[in-house]
Amino acid sequence: MFKEFKEFAVKGNAVDLAVGVIIGAAFGKIVTSLVNDILMPPLGLLTGKMDFSNLFINLSGTPVDTVAKAKAAGIPTINYGLFFNNIIDFVLVAFSVFLVVKQINRLRRPETPPPPSTRQCPFCLSPIPLAASRCPQCTSAVEPTAT
C-alpha cells in the first residue's frame, strides 16, 4: 500500500497539480491585493464610495436598519446588496486576472511551427509528401524534396 501511495505521490500529474495549486494560491493573493489596494481606491472615488452591503429585503416585517442588526436579531433577510458587492468583486478580479495573464502571455516566446511534411504538386496543386517522386492525384513526375 505504501508503494502504491509513493507511486501516486511522485507521478508527474500529482506533483504538477500540487505545484499548480500552490502557485494558484500565491497568485490569488497577488490578484486580491491588485483589486483591493490598486483598483478599488480609484473606483471608490469615482462612485462616491458606494457600498451596497446594507441593501436588503426584510422578510419578517420587524424594522431593522442594517444587515448586521438583522442577523444579530435572527431576522430573515434577502441580502441582494451583498450579492451585488460580490458580483462587482468577481468582475474586478476576473478582469484583473485577464490583464495579468495577457501581459504574461506577451512575454512568452512564440512557438516555432513544425516543418512542413507536404508540398504542393506543381501540376495539379494537390498536397503531396516531400519525398514523393510522383503525384498520387495527377500521376505527374516530380522531383523529390530533401527532408
Swiss-Prot record:
Please provide, alphabetically and separated by semicolons, the GO molecular function terms listed in this UniProt record: mechanosensitive monoatomic ion channel activity
Domain of life assignment: Bacteria
Q: Does the keyword Transmembrane apply?
A: yes
The record ties this protein, via SUPFAM superfamilies, to: Gated mechanosensitive channel (SSF81330)
What keywords is this UniProt entry annotated with? Cell inner membrane, Cell membrane, Ion channel, Ion transport, Membrane, Transmembrane, Transmembrane helix, Transport
Instruction: Give a GO cellular-component term.
Output: plasma membrane
Which InterPro entries does the protein's record reference?
MS_channel, MSC/AndL, MscL_channel
Q: Tell me how this protein sits in the membrane.
A: Multi-pass membrane protein
Task: Please describe the quaternary structure of this protein.
Answer: Homopentamer.
Keyword Transmembrane helix among record annotations: yes
Intracellular or extracellular location(s): Cell inner membrane
- Recorded family membership: Belongs to the MscL family.
> Which protein is depicted?
Large-conductance mechanosensitive channel
Short name of any one Pfam family annotated for the protein: MscL
